[in-house]
């Protein structure tokens, strides 16, 4: 029997049962729409988590002293070459930022708290959450700004306000504890109070003068890390390989190594997406098979007549499957 005739019979049979076939088509549409929507929501959550991990002063790739991750202090800092610009062959660098990030104790007139003191170049911090903060008062003007900005929650706990002074105590590059007074330029509101309590920012040059090597006037300025944001996150391994060549004695790691918990959750989201897709498509497949069996069972006499009229068994099967 010509395949064209099989198609004609199949289409005619479809329109003989409009309610059943309409419900089946609606079920398929809902299953596909649900799978697409779930996949979109999961992917959105997954990449939002990636963005948050990267913007948390991490970047896609980071250069640090080899001992810094185990013992983060200025003793494990390094000198960045003057006028350094990261150039990675075949990989576009969307932005980069040198920083000093060390644990410190911050004291007001009434209270004290432990924080991460971060010396930054504000013009380069479009790669981190710092660029998205809302400030009360002023933000840091430039790399030489000797003031400090703290979180609104930290300011509340310290019982201080914009314009007042704070004393910061931290360990310098020579291993000695140093303290210095900073005037509060402003306070920032972040997405979570944990960020507001954890970080205090000042200009990078100010932090270098405060915590750097004072043994010689010609001592180079120090940083504890260089963070890079890539235009394509998937090229991070290429960037790591080339940066290890440029910084042979440093620890060069991507965000997955620096944020292992976020990396595991990112991978888990991939698995969850596949599981949900298989479950939805499995349910749809069972529904289709059930409908096919019901359609065959209610047409036993009709199919028997087709066989009696001489239609081969294989053609009957093909016609039902095509339908």
Where are each of the predicted segments found?
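Hydrophobic alpha-helical transmembrane segments of multi-pass inner-membrane transport and secretion
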Residues: 18-45, 267-302
